[in-house]
């Protein structure tokens, strides 16, 4: 339903924010002077092998930017499909890597 889809998108938005900020804190804790913005953190996280799919994370950032500024039914359907097909996997991979490399 539309309500479930909208809830999925909202959870995606705040999960994306939490994820890139966790990557930012991990990078900073290890002496990296990266700017506190997703556009800077994503490539640096990729360079440091914190994430493996830079394109997927870039897609997430673009979707997050689009969903926060406007509502569009076609975009909502596209984002919901992306979350199901890709975003969950990307978030889980980051979580595993953070746990492994922070132990």
Please place each PLM-identified region on the residue numbering.
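Solvent-exposed interaction patches of small proteins and small membrane subunits
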Residues: 1-103
């Amino acid at each position: 339903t539309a309500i479930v889809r909208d809830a999925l998108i909202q959870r995606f938005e705040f999960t994306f924010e939490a994820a890139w900020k966790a990557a930012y804190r991990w990078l900073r804790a290890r002496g990296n002077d990266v700017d506190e913005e997703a556009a800077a953190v994503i490539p640096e996280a990729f360079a440091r092998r914190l994430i493996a799919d830079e394109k997927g994370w870039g897609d997430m950032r673009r979707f997050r930017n689009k969903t926060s500024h406007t509502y569009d039914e076609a975009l909502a359907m596209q984002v919901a499909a992306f979350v199901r097909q890709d975003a969950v996997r990307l978030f889980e991979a980051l979580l595993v890597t953070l746990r492994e490399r922070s132990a």
